[in-house]
């Protein structure tokens, strides 16, 4: 059995390598050149001693459909989640900062971000990119060299009830930081090499108010005005038969921000045609008064426009699928290449989609940045925490895999 397992790992490793070599609209280096080019780069040793640069910036913080309305896919990789070689991702961290639990909350995330910045000074840097409607900071956590020539963004929890992606992304970034510190490898290469070439940005919880609503109900919201908005949204949806569930269940299924706007319908990508009949705030589906009407969508748009990302990865739930396309996609080939690389790693189905108003759609149409949406889990949102071990195993090495892609294109 051990020999067979080794053969399976080698087969998957070869599959990933072939996809990473394919490239998108440019000619990719062969794997031997990729590895030698990465090896030739001086391993990232962190910035010069600068207390200000190392200090975390932590402020006070006080049932599901797939994102693009496509059918859930089927895992096609029987070895999904099994890593290709004796990499750092096959090891278990000792004394980890991040300990995933059901309903992993905003306050837990903030505490863990602060602890990671303290444990890995110079490797993990933190900044707030804005505040939510209810006053919570929205954090961008950078792993690696912030001034690297290549940059990749991982964004999660734009939809409130999909909060299972938050501990996933927090563990992903911790593994990158720990791998650098402990001389970890992936695909036979030191993680420090890629961390010198690529800055990994993580926004694990873009919609902290919404996540708090889905986990705690309206009592988690500080603003009385926002609580009244939520109550009015329920009354309007109840009157129009958009919902028949109790108020408590309505809160649990909440997808929007605290102002009742679906943030993934709040971007200028065929926005005018979205849900024209829904004109009031709601737990889901309301696009807002205009694109980027919300502080959370403004925060992520400003980060993207001001940083120059080479790729953006959006984590959602549910379906075990990867979406890569949109209308008028300016980065179709590159986006499809990213999707194929993730599929080779975890076996999620690769699907095209023609979504409107979403962050991925805006990235590909207007911003000219390759992007994909990865939908994790199979149960109705909020996805059962019993699925988390499988989700982690399938996605733990996604950042390293896509980091290699970005580094070589």
Question: PLM ranges: what are they?
Answer:
Residues 121-125, 134-138, 148-151, 196-201, ...:
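Loop/turn elements at helix/coil->beta-strand transitions in domains of secreted/extracellular proteins
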Residues 24-37:
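Bacterial N-terminal signal peptides
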């Amino acid at each position: 059995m051990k020999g067979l397992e080794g053969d399976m790992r080698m087969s998957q490793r070869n599959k990933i390598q072939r996809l990473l070599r394919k490239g998108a609209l440019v000619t990719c280096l062969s794997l031997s050149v990729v590895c030698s080019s990465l090896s030739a780069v001086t391993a990232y040793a962190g910035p010069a001693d600068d207390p200000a640069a190392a200090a975390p910036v932590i402020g006070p913080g006080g049932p599901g459909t797939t994102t693009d309305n496509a059918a859930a896919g089927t895992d096609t990789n029987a070895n999904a989640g099994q890593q290709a070689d004796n990499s750092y991702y096959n090891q278990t961290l000792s004394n980890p900062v991040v300990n995933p639990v059901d309903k992993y909350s905003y306050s837990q995330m903030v505490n863990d971000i602060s602890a990671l910045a303290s444990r890995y000074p110079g490797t993990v840097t933190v900044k707030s990119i804005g505040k939510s409607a209810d006053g919570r900071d929205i954090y961008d956590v950078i792993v690696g060299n912030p001034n690297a020539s290549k940059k990749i963004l991982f964004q999660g929890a734009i939809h409130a009830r999909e909060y299972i992606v938050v501990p996933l992304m927090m563990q992903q970034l911790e593994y990158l930081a720990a791998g650098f510190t402990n001389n970890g490898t992936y695909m036979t290469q030191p993680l420090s090499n890629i961390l010198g070439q690529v800055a990994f940005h993580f926004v694990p919880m873009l919609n902290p108010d919404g996540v708090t609503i889905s986990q705690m109900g309206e009592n988690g919201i500080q603003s009385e005005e926002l609580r009244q908005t939520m109550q009015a949204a329920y009354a309007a949806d109840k009157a129009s038969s958009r919902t028949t569930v109790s108020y408590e269940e309505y809160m649990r299924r909440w997808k929007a921000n605290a102002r009742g706007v679906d943030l993934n319908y709040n971007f200028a990508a065929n926005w005018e045609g979205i849900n024209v009949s829904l004109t009031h705030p709601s737990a889901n589906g309301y696009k807002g008064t205009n694109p980027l009407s919300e502080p959370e969508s403004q925060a992520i748009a400003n980060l993207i426009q001001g940083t120059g990302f080479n790729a953006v990865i959006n984590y959602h739930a549910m379906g075990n699928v990867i979406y890569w396309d949109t209308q008028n996609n300016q980065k179709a080939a590159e986006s499809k290449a990213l999707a194929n690389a993730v599929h080779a790693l975890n076996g999620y189905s690769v699907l095209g989609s023609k979504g409107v108003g979403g962050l991925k759609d805006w990235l590909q149409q207007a911003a000219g940045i390759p992007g994909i949406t990865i939908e994790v889990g199979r149960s109705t949102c909020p996805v059962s925490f019993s699925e988390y071990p499988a989700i982690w195993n399938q996605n733990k090495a996604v950042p390293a895999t896509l980091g290699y892609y970005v580094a070589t294109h």
